[in-house]
Swiss-Prot record:
Domain Globin: from-to ranges: 1-141
Taxonomy of the source species: Eukaryota, Metazoa, Chordata, Craniata, Vertebrata
Signal sequence region: none
The family this protein is said to belong to: Belongs to the globin family.
Gene Ontology CC: blood microparticle; haptoglobin-hemoglobin complex; hemoglobin complex
Quaternary state and interactors: Heterotetramer of two alpha chains and two beta chains.
Sequence positions bearing N6-succinyllysine: 7, 11, 16, 40
Domain of life: Eukaryota
Native source species: Pteropus alecto
Protein name: Hemoglobin subunit alpha
Residues bearing PTM N6-acetyllysine: 16
Expression by tissue: Red blood cells.
Length: 141
């Protein structure tokens, strides 16, 4: 459960991301594909090369979904219901992949926002991404 401090930390950190949301989303995807090659199996139709327009476009989708989640931090199930359906019923993404992407997002944010990425902010973002992952995998049960 996200505390009021966690919510404030997440919102403040996401404000710092600002217009870089697509760029950071794409970078996190690239990190995931390089660090966890099995995740590539969900993107057989993508050009996964560095700087690929398809990875950039999907990174923007990921970033925009997280921006939506931050904006609806008190109702993540409502905000992410359609995405949960998509990933559970159509794409059938293995739930572990959300944890892998979350880790890569944390690394990406830490590398771009080092002075803002305090231990407290890190913990809050980790809890937030875990909450998002839980919602996205809730329809699997």
């Amino acid at each position: 459960v996200l505390s009021s401090t966690d919510k404030s930390n997440v919102k403040a950190a996401w404000d710092k991301v600002g217009g870089h949301v697509g760029e950071y989303g794409a970078e996190a995807l690239e990190r995931m594909f390089l660090s966890f090659p099995t995740t590539k199996t969900y993107f057989p139709h993508f050009d996964l090369a560095h700087g690929s327009s398809q990875v950039k476009a999907h990174g923007k989708k990921v970033g925009d979904a997280l921006t939506n989640a931050v904006g609806h931090i008190d109702d993540l199930p409502g905000a992410l219901s359609a995405l949960s359906d998509l990933h559970a019923y159509k794409l059938r993404v293995d739930p572990v992949n959300f944890k892998l992407l979350s880790h890569c997002l944390l690394v990406t944010l830490a590398s771009h926002l080092p002075s803002d990425f305090t231990p407290a902010v890190h913990a809050s973002l980790d809890k937030f991404l875990a909450s998002v992952s839980t919602v996205l995998t809730s329809k699997y049960r």
